[in-house]
């Protein structure tokens, strides 16, 4: 254990997700040895992100103004909404350059064991967005795990009666993966989500 502010820094760094005590200590000592200009730049970035970044009033993605850049873009297809759990999922989908619609970030997934129910997520706001009839398809892109599946099923039941097309991202085998290492659920989904191959 170190003295005073050094230990305080290690403790604060250790509170970050994925940073254990050893990593926190390494980062703290890296910062102590770093150029003061670099440390100030990091401190400024941390302060500014907390002061200036908010959540989009429409989709709950991260934004620096009332609307995120995606919701503010008139070229995006307003008839398609892709529902994701977290803002990082928006970034992952945007990297593919396959989706030209808009998003809705739930802020998590239904997890009764973790104490997260439907009322803890941005589901009411999603239903309100769908009410004007602009959206024709809702793509459920929650994580392919138990919580994501529960959330997708819940949303499909809630939104199905609205007459929208509700789809779920196909899940299956990763590129470069071996069949022998695939679990039964993944392999089963790969068969269910198979598509025609044109010769």
From Swiss-Prot:
Annotated ranges, domain Toprim: 79-174
Keyword DNA damage in record: yes
PROSITE patterns for this protein: RECR, TOPRIM
InterPro entries, per the entry: DNA_Rcmb_RecR, Hlx-hairpin-Hlx_DNA-bd_motif, Rcmb_RecR, Rcmb_RecR_Znf, TOPRIM_dom, TOPRIM_RecR
UniProt GO MF annotations: DNA binding; zinc ion binding
GO biological process, one term: DNA recombination
ZnF locations on chain (C4-type): 56-71
Superkingdom, taxonomy of origin: Bacteria
Coiled coil: none
Keyword list, A-Z: DNA damage, DNA recombination, DNA repair, Metal-binding, Zinc, Zinc-finger
Family as reported in the entry's similarity comment: Belongs to the RecR family.
NCBIfam families registered for this protein in UniProt: recR (TIGR00615)
Role of this protein: May play a role in DNA repair. It seems to be involved in an RecBC-independent recombinational process of DNA repair. It may act with RecF and RecO.
Protein name in UniProt: Recombination protein RecR
Gene of this entry: recR
